[in-house]
């Protein structure tokens, strides 16, 4: 696929350091570069390969707040502001493609200048990942406190329902009955908890076809979040960054899937009398998912505009595989580089060390912290899953109790 394929474009302003002014235009992201095009002249004012970017940050300007800064080789810093629809949306998409490129193409680090080694870049990447995991752990802690408060509220509700049950039993007991308040015994009451628990059994495990990280937005494009898309044999599942299920599309419930580009798809489920459920997903790994969606949802998927290039890529790759499978005698002659710039670059890449001992120790410390955070997060998620199961059972039991007591009160009236 061509590296000039547009992933997304956003309206924004770029700061010209020499002229000390902001210029309006469009920020365009491709799979391997970031470009800023001036609105009036349509001139490409800035063109940055993603492999040359060292750092992407969210910062604030003294004059225009809410900016994104991009630091490239040579310590050149670029400012982008007035981002539409929002700064967070643009930042999430750009950072996602930048990270995926760094992880999938480690050889691009050979061009890093001498003052920024590959080890330093890897440390920065791992430090950002550690910060994200720490933020996720804080969010999980807050979520755990909310679940605990919900459980306490349900326990209080259950005790109140027990009091109401005793009062109703007193009211239902005739004054001439000499054996206390135990007059009628409700047979349904004995098997109440058993019936609720039997209806709350979890779904069986399904075969996972593929799972990819993605930027997720629901209806409003101005709000997006990090997450992942999981393609199952009989469904599509969308999760947030904490691996909590946002929505599950059963295969028969999906009404249409639109492929806006090889990196962007939208999934919709229509309803009558209430808003449709629609999600828009952007991912650097989406070209691996679209062929699977075409097979599973052949009658519901629609390729739009630039997405047609994806099929051309499939045909081209199949032709390349066919050519590679020819016998050696039929393989066309191909000259190998015999020196020059390519040979020097390969030799430089071999001689350049990956990282020093100090950087290796720092990476080891970061990885050990991330391992501990991952284990704590996994344990917390399991605890919250159990808490959610308990909440589900308690809510169903409370609902049945309320319905039963409402019927008893109607009989007394």
UniProtKB/Swiss-Prot annotation:
Q: Where is the t-SNARE coiled-coil homology domain?
A: 109-171, 350-412
Q: Which organism is it from?
A: Mus musculus
* Entry comment describing in which tissues the protein is expressed: Ubiquitously expressed with the most abundant expression in the brain. In brain, most highly expressed in the glomerular layer of the olfactory bulb, the cortex, striatum, hippocampus, and colliculi (at protein level).
Give the family from UniProt: Belongs to the SVAP1 family.
Q: Where in the cell is it found?
A: Endomembrane system; Cytoplasm, Perinuclear region
In this chain, the stretch annotated as Disordered covers 321-342
Name under which the protein is recorded: Synaptosomal-associated protein 47
What's the name of its gene? Answer: Snap47
**Lineage, highest ranks first:** Eukaryota, Metazoa, Chordata, Craniata, Vertebrata
GO BP terms, alphabetized: exocytic insertion of neurotransmitter receptor to postsynaptic membrane; long-term synaptic potentiation; vesicle-mediated transport in synapse
Its function, per the record, reads: May play a role in intracellular membrane fusion.
Q: Which GO terms describe its cellular component?
A: dendrite; endomembrane system; glutamatergic synapse; hippocampal mossy fiber to CA3 synapse; membrane; neuronal cell body; perinuclear region of cytoplasm; postsynaptic density
> Self-association or partners: how does it assemble?
Associates with the BLOC-1 complex. Interacts with BLOC1S6. Forms a complex containing SNAP47, VAMP2 and STX1A.
Identify the InterPro entries for this entry.
PH-like_dom_sf, T_SNARE_dom
Q: State whether keyword Hydrolase applies.
A: no
The answer, when asked if Membrane is one of the entry's keywords, is: yes
* SUPFAM superfamilies named among the record's database cross-references: SNARE fusion complex
CDD domains according to UniProt:
SNARE_SNAP47N
Q: Which UniProt keywords apply?
A: Coiled coil, Cytoplasm, Membrane, Repeat
Organism superkingdom: Eukaryota
